[in-house]
Amino acid sequence: MRPVELLIPASSLEVLKIAVIYGADAVYIGGEVFGLRAKAKNFSMEDMAEGIQFAHEHGVKVYVTANILAHNGDLEGVREYFTQLKEIKPDALIISDPGIYTIAKEICPEIERHISTQANNTNYGTYQFWWNQGAKRVVTARELSLNEIAEIRKNIPDEMEIETFVHGAMCISYSGRCLLSLSLIHIS
């Protein structure tokens, strides 16, 4: 069995440092753009650079979210953003949009790419697809049971990593899915 990685979200440089000092194996952060935590404080590029350096000095990894579902107008800015991130060397990018994924693979292929839970990863076929695209890790959809996650594990390459939330927010509404009926009567 693989060791579990304790991955902690950090909303600021101060929180990142506390997570590192208190034993996180990895921390994920969002920048001022291209992440879904629009109301969070998030990190400036300077704070990201300082946080990544601090974490690396303590043997802790840092993953940066770029998990928006992009519109056409976002793509040029994403290119600039990844060019800047390449310089400060995060350990991975957490992405949900295939277009953004393609840009990350082109601009910073040396940085691992993880697929966000926002990509609704609910089956092993999806995991195999992302593995074939070069993703090292896929974050499960939060709605999956342990049995469903175990079935995914059995049907993907051993080298591929699965990440899952142990605790956190779960949206009750999602276009095309009725999570209430899924929970109550197992039909979406």
Regions found by a protein language model. Name each.
Residues 2-4, 24-25, 56-62, 90-91, ...:
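Short, well-ordered coil/turn segments that N-cap beta-strands
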Residues 2-28, 32:
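N-terminal basic/disordered segments at the start of proteins
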Residues 6-9, 27-29, 62-66, 93-95, ...:
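Hydrophobic faces of well-ordered beta-strands that scaffold small-molecule active sites
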Residues 19, 97, 130, 164:
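Conserved, mostly hydrophobic/aromatic
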Residues 28-47, 66-74:
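Glycine-rich, proline-tolerant flexible connector loops at the mouths of alpha/beta enzymes
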Residues 39-49, 96-108, 143-157:
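Active-site-adjacent beta->alpha loops and helix N-cap segments on the catalytic face
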Residues 60-129:
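N-terminal active-site wall of soluble small-molecule enzyme domains
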Residues 185-187:
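Conserved small/polar residues in nucleotide/adenosyl-binding loops
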